[in-house]
Amino acid sequence: MASGGSPVWALVALLSLLPLVARGERAVGAPEEVPVSNPGVQEAARFALEAYNRASNSMFCYKPVRVLKAETQVVSGMQYYLTVEIVNTRCEKKVGCGLKNMGSENCAVPSEAEQKQICEFVVWSRPWMQDTRLSSISCTPSSS
């Protein structure tokens, strides 16, 4: 017997989602905007910037200016989608780029405000496995 009914079931499944879309509701598991002050967001931003500093070719550390936007998505763990404004400092990487070192005068921000960048980070956290990963980085110079 031919299985010609499968396209019909796909259409029925798709049509069943229309009421959710029409009301503006999000599908279960879709990314959801959260306050930038959320502790999980702040921890993910800290992790992302430390990973960015390790990976960058700059001799100096970057530090966060502010988290501009944050979304979370429940996956196998929590995925954080972050838009963060960062700035280059005068703090040399050999001193360390941890937040405790960022307050010193050596980590002052150069007067050239062109050092700012807007970065999109995706951080995947699975706390029960003590596993946090930076899945994606994309930075562009800030226009402000």
Curated annotation (Swiss-Prot):
Keywords: Disulfide bond, Protease inhibitor, Secreted, Signal, Thiol protease inhibitor. GO terms for cellular component: extracellular exosome. Residues 1-26 form the signal peptide. It holds the Pfam family Cystatin. A motif (Secondary area of contact) lies at residues 73-77. GO terms for molecular function: cysteine-type endopeptidase inhibitor activity. It is found in: Secreted. Residues 29-128 form the Cystatin domain. The record marks 29 as: Reactive site. Gene3D superfamilies: 3.10.450.10. Disulfide bonds join 91-107, 119-139. Expressed by the venom gland. It comes from the Eukaryota. PANTHER family: CYSTATIN-M. Inhibits various C1 cysteine proteases including cathepsin L, papain and cathepsin B. This protein has no toxic activity and its function in the venom is unknown. It may play a role as a housekeeping or regulatory protein. Belongs to the cystatin family. This is Cystatin-POGU1. It comes from Pogona barbata. The lineage of its organism: Eukaryota, Metazoa, Chordata, Craniata, Vertebrata.
